[in-house]
Swiss-Prot record:
Ranges annotated as biased composition (Low complexity): 410-424
Disulfide bond sites: 127-177, 138-161, 144-171, 228-238, 272-281
Topology class, membrane: Multi-pass membrane protein
Ranges that cross the membrane: 40-60, 334-354
Name recorded for this polypeptide: P2X purinoceptor 6
Positions on the Extracellular side per record topology: 61-333
Cytoplasmic side: 11-39, 355-441
The species this protein was found in: Homo sapiens (Human)
Subunit structure as annotated in this protein's UniProt entry: Monomer. Unlike, all of the other P2RX subunits, P2RX6 does not seem to form functional homotrimers. Forms heterotrimer with P2RX2; with characteristics clearly different from those of P2RX2 homomeric receptors. Forms heterotrimer with P2RX4; functional differences between homomeric P2RX4 and P2RX4/6 heterotrimer are minor. Forms a P2RX2/P2RX4/P2RX6 heterotrimer. Interacts with SF3A1; resulting in a reduction of the splicing activity.
One MF term in the entry's GO annotations: ATP binding
Length: 441
């Protein structure tokens, strides 16, 4: 029995392959344009990016290295030298490290005494205020309110106006007497301090790379640091500096700083390239003048007699040294190298995008390049004629199969007496035509 013709028109649905589009590989379409202006600009920008990435970011700035920007450090300082002063208040006095260095144990901040003003044997009592103090001069007692004390006063007013000397009358105060004169010596008393030497020992550690190094030469010679002086080329691992040279490198004059004091900053910077080993890590020293005036007061107390405390007041002028240690260490790493190269590749992509914008929107032939670069592909639509053509081909195939079966030899009786059945009706005529249909389904 032949299959019915009603099923002859079934067709494969386009949706039968739905889902396989996710596995398709899509590639870009490249259009070669003969526009020398945009082409030259693209090559110029690409060349600049390659030079920047390779020459500057990768090699000059060592973009292929991992960085440790937080070093751990320790500092030990020592000052060496002696000086002698001859003044009326103290007589002949020798000054050594314990006298002119504050604090004497050596830290990253210390003070070198270069000048001083001494007021010996002060005891608490009543005495005239110094005329240089604001509101200290007076004519009558009413000019000195009792209990009043000013910001710059040496004590508290007693309410009396007394004679200071032959030319001045000042308010009497309760204070450490006699009061400080306030007259600074005309020349530094410790002028020999410019020949003192400063030893700075610094050890830096980069824990990220488990690396540690000192700025002082490792030597068994105990006299090496007694004779050497720092020179960047000849003795970079001898951190011994002459004070006068150090102040000059900071941009100051020792005589000026020694008179009224000042502040000098010393920076020790480590820039270590650990790819070259220990030889690629050494310190750089720089000096900066921070202040041109610095002083403070200190006193030595004792008991002059039972119940009477006395002191010697020193107003110290000198140079304060602030030592700052900074540093960084670098070593080759795959991640920073990949990041640097990836950044360069991204910039090359930006150049291509920029040139596309010029070509498609700015160039005189932009409309032509637009039509060439972008194409619209539309899927063909199914029409009535194509559907009926499919049905006709399927019907003819089924008719041929039916005729082949009907022309087969007659069946013979079998042993059981049964025989093969013939088709129940004749095949359709070969000249039977499907009705034509125009228009869309």
């Amino acid at each position: 029995m032949c299959p019915q013709l009603a099923g002859a028109g079934s067709m494969g649905s386009p949706g039968a392959t739905t889902g396989w589009g996710l596995l398709d590989y899509k590639t870009e379409k490249y259009v070669m344009t003969r526009n020398w202006r945009v082409g030259a600009l693209q090559r110029l920008l690409q060349f600049g990016i390659v030079v920047y990435v390779v020459g500057w970011a990768l090699l000059a700035k060592k973009g292929y290295q991992e960085r440790d920007l937080e070093p751990q450090f320790s500092i030990i300082t020592k000052l060496k030298g002696v000086s002698v002063t001859q003044i009326k208040e103290l007589g002949n006095r020798l000054w050594d490290v314990a006298d002119f260095v504050k604090p004497p144990q050596g830290e990253n901040v210390f003070f070198l005494v270069t000048n001083f003003l001494v007021t010996p044997a002060q005891v608490q009592g009543r005495c005239p205020e110094h005329p240089s103090v604001p509101l200290a001069n007076c004519w009558v007692d009413e000019d000195c309110p009792e209990g009043e004390g000013g910001t710059h006063s040496h004590g508290v007013k007693t309410g009396q106006c007394v004679v200071f000397n032959g030319t001045h009358r000042t308010c009497e105060i309760w204070s450490w007497c006699p009061v400080e004169s306030g007259v600074v010596p005309s020349r530094p008393l410790l002028a020999q301090a410019q020949n003192f030497t400063l030893f700075i020992k610094n050890t830096v550690t980069f824990s990220k790379f488990n690396f540690s190094k000192s700025n002082a030469l490792e030597t068994w010679d105990p006299t090496y640091f007694k004779h050497c002086r720092y020179e960047p080329q000849f003795s970079p691992y001898c951190p011994v500096f002459r004070i006068g040279d150090l102040v000059a490198k900071a941009g100051g004059t020792f005589e000026d700083l020694a008179l009224l004091g000042g502040s000098v900053g010393i920076r020790v910077h480590w820039d270590c390239d650990l790819d070259t080993g220990d030889s690629g890590c050494w310190p750089h020293y720089s000096f900066q003048l921070q202040e041109k005036s610095y002083n403070f007061r200190t006193a030595t107390h004792w008991w002059e007699q039972p119940g009477v405390e006395a002191r010697t007041l020193l107003k110290l002028y000198g140079i304060r040294f602030d030592i700052l240690v900074t540093g960084q260490a670098g070593k080759f790493g795959l991640i920073p190298t990949a990041v640097t190269l990836g950044t360069g590749a991204a910039w090359l992509g930006v150049v291509t995008f920029f040139c596309d914008l010029l070509l498609l929107y700015v160039d005189r032939e932009a409309h032509f390049y637009w039509r060439t670069k972008y194409e619209e592909a539309k899927a063909p639509k199914a029409t009535a004629n194509s559907v009926w053509r499919e049905l006709a081909l399927a019907s003819q195939a089924r008719l041929a199969e039916c005729l082949r079966r009907s022309s087969a030899p007659a069946p013979t009786a079998t042993a059981a007496g049964s025989q093969t059945q013939t088709p129940g009706w004749p095949c359709p005529s070969s000249d039977t035509h499907l009705p034509t249909h125009s228009g869309s389904l």
